[in-house]
């Protein structure tokens, strides 16, 4: 569900910043109560905020990945220390790992296709 303009913008932003960044990865931000090892990691359990008041957590979507060849060969990873994170809209960040996610993506695709007629 990635838009053409997002691909173009990613390429242009990375190209303009080759002196600063080795790679670009698309990301989305979420305000969710996150836990690890049975403990909250982004809030105090004694003072649980509403989710809309949480600091957004960034998640790579890997919809678009751009990396300098030299950096990729050196790190063997598209996410480098000098990575440009490009935020995409939630509907562009849909991941398809199972049937339910495929059904959601198909529904959204058809909805956006019909809206753009």
Place the predicted regions along the sequence by residue.
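Conserved core of the sugar-phosphate nucleotidyltransferase
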Residues: 1-89
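Hydrophobic helical membrane-anchoring modules
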Residues: 74, 86-87, 91-117
């Amino acid at each position: 569900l990635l838009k053409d303009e997002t691909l173009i913008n990613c390429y242009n932003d990375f190209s303009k910043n080759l002196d600063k960044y080795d790679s670009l990865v698309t990301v989305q931000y979420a305000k969710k109560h996150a836990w690890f090892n049975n403990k909250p990691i982004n809030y105090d359990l004694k003072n649980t905020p509403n989710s809309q008041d949480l600091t957004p957590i960034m998640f790579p979507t890997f919809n678009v990945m751009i990396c300098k060849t030299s950096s990729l060969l050196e790190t063997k990873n598209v996410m480098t220390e000098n990575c440009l994170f490009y935020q995409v809209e939630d509907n562009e960040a849909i991941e398809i790992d199972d049937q339910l996610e495929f059904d959601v993506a198909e529904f959204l695709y058809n909805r956006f296709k019909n809206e753009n007629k």
